[in-house]
Amino acid sequence: DGEVIGQQFPSDTGPIDLLAVSKDESELLVIELKRGRVSDVVVGQIQRYMGYVVSELAEENQTVRGVIIGLEDDLRLQRALSVAVNIEFYRYQVDFKLFKG
């Protein structure tokens, strides 16, 4: 209904790609979008953004989670995420076709 539910959000650690609030407002979701293969470096990046959200935006009763979205991951990213709290990785798939006429 015209309500913005996720958008790029400025922080003191850099711009957060998307910051979303759950319908019941119990959760803030930091979303980092990456093209192609995702490096383990992004784990530190999203943790900085999540730290900003915890310190500056979240209320006591709100949970802060992170989601990394990319085309593919690798073993280093999997290892880093295995010990990262409240961060998940999702793969996207693009099937783009162009037809003349």
Which stretches of residues belong to each language-model region?
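Charged, terminal alpha-helix-loop-beta segments
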Residues: 1-101
